């Protein structure tokens, strides 16, 4: 996939950067492009009226990675964004949550599923829910 005119490499090979500056530079460009696509999408959702709010108010999106450092195949810590109002079921307002080390990402998935009304008590390797949502 062509991310930018100056980055023609695929994401996966670039993510295994070997701490080489030229690969890290490409990785940053690709990740910035990804984030810009997500931001553009969220703006469209926020700008689209839906009932008493916007589509973004009535939805929830999670954006992130399954790796912290893909070069090392490290899974912790994993930065993720949770955006949207979940139809009034999610706390809003710029929270920054730092979960205990080695908290399974499945706990976030399970928590969001429960918040939007899916009756599940387990998902993947979940060990609990995130009450701060």
Go through each PLM region and give its residues.
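Ligand-binding pockets and gating/stacking loops
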Residues: 1-133
């Amino acid at each position: 996939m062509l991310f930018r005119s100056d980055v023609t490499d695929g994401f996966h090979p670039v993510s295994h950067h070997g701490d080489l500056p030229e690969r890290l530079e490409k990785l940053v460009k690709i990740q910035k492009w990804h984030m810009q696509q997500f931001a553009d999408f969220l703006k469209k959702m926020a700008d689209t009226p839906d009932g008493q709010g916007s589509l973004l108010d009535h939805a929830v999106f999670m954006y992130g990675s399954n790796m912290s450092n893909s070069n090392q195949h490290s899974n912790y810590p994993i930065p993720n964004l949770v955006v949207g109002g979940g139809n009034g079921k999610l706390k809003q307002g710029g929270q920054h949550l730092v979960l205990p080390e080695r908290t399974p990402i499945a706990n976030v998935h399970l928590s969001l599923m429960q918040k939007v009304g899916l009756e599940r008590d387990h998902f993947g390797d979940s060990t609990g829910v995130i009450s701060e949502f």
